[in-house]
């Protein structure tokens, strides 16, 4: 039986389009993503509040304190404290500082923006990154031994220090106090005198 010409043409066109679509959607590779969700739960005690927002106030410094790229100044400690952790909680609880709009992947530090942060009413995070980026300076997050915690790196390579739980007063639950540093850090360009603000989100990582 012969197939009519027009029908044969339609079949050929369909086959050609299918081949083109298949080629257009061909993959160059595959990303396999894995993870683990634990039923371990702790309560974030500090920073408190519904959004667990902590304001770390760096000291007012002279721009002359930041001369060469990588120079740090104004190191300021801050804590993230957990409570009501289960007694079975293991050692090495730490913060994972999440990548976000303020992350500079080329330096591993946080972009700083020329603005004053307000707490009442609270400045919206989107307003921070909408401000003009500060020149010549960023903000670095470090461990207490001053080793850099690399922003934009994954949890395994970020190098944030882990902390061990302690028995909570008056019970068997545990508390964890994580201690880190924030500081100014010199980057390319001349440092401009101005107020600066930046931010970074964090997640608690359990052993």
From Swiss-Prot:
Secretion signal span: 1-26
Record keywords, A-Z: Disulfide bond, Fimbrium, Signal
SUPFAM superfamilies on file: Bacterial adhesins
GO terms for cellular component: pilus
InterPro entries recorded: Adhesion_dom_fimbrial_sf, Adhesion_dom_sf, Bact_Fimbrial_Adh_Pro, FimA-like
A Pfam family that the UniProt record links to this protein: FimA
Domain of life where this protein originates: Bacteria
Organism: Bordetella pertussis (strain Tohama I / ATCC BAA-589 / NCTC 13251)
Lineage of the species this protein comes from: Bacteria, Pseudomonadati, Pseudomonadota, Betaproteobacteria, Burkholderiales
Protein name: Serotype 2 fimbrial subunit
Subcellular location: Fimbrium
Family: Belongs to the fimbrial protein family.
Record function comment: Bordetella pertussis is the causative agent of whooping cough. An essential step in the disease process is the attachment of the bacteria to the ciliated epithelium of the respiratory tract, enabling the organism to resist normal host-clearance mechanisms. It is unclear which bacterial cell surface component are responsible for adherence but the fimbriae of B.pertussis are prime candidates for being involved in this process.
Disulphide bonds in the chain: 42-85
GO biological process annotation, one example: cell adhesion involved in single-species biofilm formation
């Amino acid at each position: 039986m012969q197939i009519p010409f027009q029908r044969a043409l339609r079949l050929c066109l369909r086959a050609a389009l299918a081949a083109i679509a298949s080629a257009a959607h061909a993959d160059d590779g595959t990303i396999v993503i894995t993870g683990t969700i634990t039923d371990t739960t702790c309560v974030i005690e500090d920073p408190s509040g519904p959004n667990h927002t902590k304001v770390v106030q760096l000291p007012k410094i002279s721009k002359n304190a930041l001369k060469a790229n990588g120079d740090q100044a104004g190191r300021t400690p801050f804590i993230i404290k957990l409570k009501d952790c289960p007694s079975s909680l293991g050692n090495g609880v730490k913060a994972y500082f999440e990548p976000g709009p303020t992350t500079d992947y080329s330096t591993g530090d946080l972009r700083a923006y020329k603005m004053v942060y307000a707490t009442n009413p609270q400045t919206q995070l989107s307003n921070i990154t909408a401000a003009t980026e500060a020149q010549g300076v960023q903000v670095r997050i470090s461990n207490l031994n001053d080793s850099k915690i690399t922003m934009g790196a994954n949890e395994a390579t970020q190098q944030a220090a882990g902390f061990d739980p302690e028995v909570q007063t008056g019970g068997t639950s545990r508390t964890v106090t994580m201690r880190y540093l924030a500081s100014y850090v010199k980057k390319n360009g001349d440092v401009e005198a101005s107020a600066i603000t930046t931010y970074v989100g964090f997640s608690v990582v359990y052993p």
